[in-house]
């Protein structure tokens, strides 16, 4: 089973779904995307979540939407944002 499903993709738009997740990662990705040059829209939505009896967490399949201007490739910006998140985590690990 995939963790990420690409629902729609063009040069300037991408919509993806994170399987069995909550607001945490989706909100972080959205915030980092909004800081990137060329991003017109970065948003996410969560359908009504369900309680996972094994973890006690409310989970859903959040959908992340990214729209960029005509000069900016949406997939490239998304990959840059994800790399920035990984870099931040690595920096934090080194400082602990």
Curated annotation (Swiss-Prot):
SUPFAM superfamilies: RBP11-like subunits of RNA polymerase
Listed EC numbers: 2.7.7.6
Nucleotide-binding is among the record's keywords: no
The keyword Cytoplasm is assigned to this record: yes
Keywords from the named record: Cytoplasm, DNA-directed RNA polymerase, Nucleotidyltransferase, Transcription, Transferase
Protein location: Cytoplasm
One record GO biological process: DNA-templated transcription
A Pfam family reported for this protein in Swiss-Prot or TrEMBL: RNA_pol_L_2
Example GO molecular function: DNA-directed RNA polymerase activity
Catalytic activity: RNA(n) + a ribonucleoside 5'-triphosphate = RNA(n+1) + diphosphate
Superkingdom assignment: Archaea
CC terms in the record's Gene Ontology section: cytoplasm; DNA-directed RNA polymerase complex
NCBIfam families xrefs: PRK01146.1-2
Similarity comment: family membership: Belongs to the archaeal Rpo11/eukaryotic RPB11/RPC19 RNA polymerase subunit family.
Role description: DNA-dependent RNA polymerase (RNAP) catalyzes the transcription of DNA into RNA using the four ribonucleoside triphosphates as substrates.
Subunit structure: Part of the RNA polymerase complex.
HAMAP family per the UniProt record, alphabetical: RNApol_arch_Rpo11
Protein name: DNA-directed RNA polymerase subunit Rpo11
Organism of origin: Methanococcus maripaludis (strain C6 / ATCC BAA-1332)
